Structures are given as structure tokens and as C-alpha cells.
Amino acid sequence: MQTQRASLSLGRWSLWLLLLGLVVPSASAQALSYREAVLRAVDQLNELSSEANLYRLLELDPPPKDNEDLGTRKPVSFTVKETVCPRTIQQPAEQCDFKEKGRVKQCVGTVTLDPSNDQFDLNCNELQSVILPWKWPWWPWRRG
């Protein structure tokens, strides 16, 4: 009697493991969206950064119009902005407010949509604000 119960229990566990094995690969094979892939790249940039504060996605250019092949590198272009959260904090950058007058960086490169592949190739450069010299308008003192 005891042997039959143990055998039945083992059979149930085997069935559960089989079902779990069928479900897990299909879940991991789903491609990341273009935005999700970029957000993962921003997270990696924050981890590798030596700057004091985290950066957060500010603007994302439209995705390329090509196939959804997981392994293919996709070109990306986006801007990130410095947040008020220190880099040492264990908080997602998406939950941090942008820093007033924080640095803004333009990033270009490639990412993959494969959730098991965190490889990306990005180059981010700080955008410099352009200050135009203000001149007095000439028209009020126009001579006729």
C-alpha cells in the first residue's frame, strides 16, 4: 500500500516537471519588445556607469521596420536624462524623477530582442545646451 502511494506521488511529480519543462521554454523564447530591450540596455548602462546618479529613458526613436528575429541586432537611438536617484540605490531608474537641469545623453547603437542575451553595443554622448547670444532688435531704432 505504501509503495503504491509512493509510486503514485512520484508519477505526479514527474507529470508536474514535464509540464513545467514545456511551459518554461515557450515563456523564455518570447521576444522582448523594442522598448523593453532599450530599457534593459539603459539598466546595463546604469550598472556600468561611474557617474553619481542613475539615468532614465527620456525619448525613444521609432523602431526599425524589419523582422522580429531574436538574435538579430536592432539599431536603436534614444536619449536618457539624469535622475535624482543615486546610482548606489537599489531602485529601478523608471521610478526616479528626472533631475532639474540634469545631464542629457544621446545614445545610438544596437540591442537584441532575445531575453536571454543582454548584449548591446551603445555609444552615449552628452548633449550640450546651445545658448544663443541675445541681441537687441534693430527695428525699433530704424531710421527712415
UniProtKB/Swiss-Prot annotation:
Annotated positions of the Arginine amide modification: R143
Any keyword Disulfide bond?
Answer: yes
Any one Gene Ontology biological process term? innate immune response
GO cellular component terms given for this protein: extracellular space
Name the domain of life this protein comes from: Eukaryota
| Mod. after translation | Elastase might be responsible for its maturation.
Q: Which Gene3D superfamilies match?
A: 3.10.450.10
Tissue-specific expression: Large granules of neutrophils.
**GO MF annotation terms:** lipopolysaccharide binding
Q: Does the keyword Calcium apply?
A: no
Cystine pairings recorded for this chain: C85-C96, C107-C124
Signal peptide range in chain numbering: 1-29
Propeptide, chain numbering: 30-130
Keyword field: Amidation, Antibiotic, Antimicrobial, Disulfide bond, Fungicide, Secreted, Signal
State what this protein does: Potent microbicidal activity; active against S.aureus and E.coli.
Similarity comment: family membership: Belongs to the cathelicidin family.
Q: What name does this protein carry?
A: Cathelicidin-4
Q: Which organism is it from?
A: Bos taurus
Q: What is the lineage of its organism?
A: Eukaryota, Metazoa, Chordata, Craniata, Vertebrata
